[in-house]
Amino acid sequence: MAAGGSTQQRRREMAAASAAAISGAGRCRLSKIGATRRPPPARVRVAVRLRPFVDGTAGASDPPCVRGMDSCSLEIANWRNHQETLKYQFDAFYGERSTQQDIYAGSVQPILRHLLEGQNASVLAYGPTGAGKTHTMLGSPEQPGVIPRALMDLLQLTREEGAEGRPWALSVTMSYLEIYQEKVLDLLDPASGDLVIREDCRGNILIPGLSQKPISSFADFERHFLPASRNRTVGATRLNQRSSRSHAVLLVKVDQRERLAPFRQREGKLYLIDLAGSEDNRRTGNKGLRLKESGAINTSLFVLGKVVDALNQGLPRVPYRDSKLTRLLQDSLGGSAHSILIANIAPERRFYLDTVSALNFAARSKEVINRPFTNESLQPHALGPVKLSQKELLGPPEAKRARGPEEEEIGSPEPMAAPASASQKLSPLQKLSSMDPAMLERLLSLDRLLASQGSQGAPLLSTPKRERMVLMKTVEEKDLEIERLKTKQKELEAKMLAQKAEEKENHCPTMLRPLSHRTVTGAKPLKKAVVMPLQLIQEQAASPNAEIHILKNKGRKRKLESLDALEPEEKAEDCWELQISPELLAHGRQKILDLLNEGSARDLRSLQRIGPKKAQLIVGWRELHGPFSQVEDLERVEGITGKQMESFLKANILGLAAGQRCGAS
């Protein structure tokens, strides 16, 4: 009893230690299937930078059209009423005396810490052409911009956090691309051609085939970035001698891997985006290729505005796919990134409309809500110890066993009764790491019950060996049953086909004969009557000696067209034809001619196909040229064509003939 109590105590202690040791692994396993920690929603932060007057600019002595009020607000003249000003409120405002360090430290540097938490961040430079976007992002050797400052600080952070002795190992990679005329081009590998933008099952935007360069120091970054920057497309316009003709995107990825259990891994992305500026082709003087480039830039920026409006209005469809720029910015606007928009504006009055447009876009963008999250997953090799322990539970290979057939069939209970190594006891509990302590206690009770039964010599039917054998036997039986069913189905199908063929032979012998021996037994065709205008009816009571015969039965024989064309049989077929007496036709013509020569315009309208206009034409022609000599002279009237004349005769002569026939009857 004492030994049994000590064994139970050891098992209880091992269960508690196992639950505490692998609780983190259970959480990581949940994160692998999408259970990520989500921080609260984050609004897109907007900063506005006012560049100084450019040297040599005409009208530099004039007062600027924009004026800063404090560190977060500015005002601009109202073009509708010059006595008023429009005020804008943003997260930050940097005047014309602000430096590159002020902008970086105030707006960009605070979001870098999110990368080490496995979250995404984005920095976008927006504004019209010549407003200083590229200077803000790249800068100069004397005044470095956002990109070199961010990379320098980020690499320093990764070196500190990934140093020896720290729980995480960090690595940094970079990619650099441009969107030129709706084509995604790799600036690190210009020969790669147009790349496609994809979306994985978790909604992450990726570009297959995009180059990724590992960097561990700022020197590594410069070695890759400087040659790639020279590959970006630039051109000269009237407003800017080095105008960016494409949108440039620098993607920096930070991978983190935990050195200790539960061996988690994180991935954070930093998007540094230099957007091309919107252009007014009337002022830039773009022609040819420059005009085509300007059209592509303005179109993508217009779609960007539509995306912002759709997000603010809560529309069910956000047009990310209408442009490759918005498709790539899906994480930055309304996605999972901490985003900062730097709107660059110019103080000159000639850029007033562009400045107002940029400020309105910035004001709409600050209403966009992003939902960042920490993307954690479990490293693949973290599941290795669990798999090894499961293999150990299956026992040694068959070749190393020296047991009889009875032991191999039933299994030995000794390994379950005696305490084994710690790994063998911990591995079953690792599967249950997500359960609460009460459930673990119940499983321990069941384990004790099974152990007590095993110690009494009862066969353990739940051993892995037994389970495999029973499962294999069940699978073999199911396979045999399936084969028998398939064979039986084929026999039934063959029998049904034979029955159908026999029924066709018995009930449809003519269908199985050759075509040349088939006999045509068609029914006698019905008589057909040709119904002419005014429903001409055959008068059965008419006298055979009558002067006018409207219908006459005319019989003629036709050959039946058989399928094989071999039967010489001929069938007589009766049909009805319309035959009008010449006297009736002459009488109808004369009556129409009298009406044309003597009738008024109202009388003429009683004729078919004659309306008020044609009646007036007939009366006028008759007054000028005299009476008609024949009905066909009606075609000489101006406005009556030959086709109209034929239609007139058919409609009126037959109608009058039928009317006279009915009157005679």
Swiss-Prot record:
Molecular-function annotations in GO: ATP binding; ATP hydrolysis activity; DNA binding; microtubule binding; microtubule motor activity
Cellular component per GO, a single term: nuclear speck
Biased composition (Low complexity): 412-428
Residues recorded as bearing Phosphoserine in the entry: S412, S427, S452, S543, S562, S581
Chain intervals for the UniProt region annotation (Disordered): 379-428
All residue ranges annotated as the Kinesin motor domain in the record: 43-368
Residues reported to bind ATP: G127, P128, T129, G130, A131, G132, K133, T134
Modification after translation (UniProt): Ubiquitinated; mediated by SIAH1 and leading to its subsequent proteasomal degradation.
Subunit structure, interactors included: Interacts with FAM83D. Interacts with SIAH1.
Main function: Kinesin family member that is involved in spindle formation and the movements of chromosomes during mitosis and meiosis. Binds to microtubules and to DNA. Plays a role in congression of laterally attached chromosomes in NDC80-depleted cells.
Protein name as annotated: Kinesin-like protein KIF22
Lineage: Eukaryota, Metazoa, Chordata, Craniata, Vertebrata
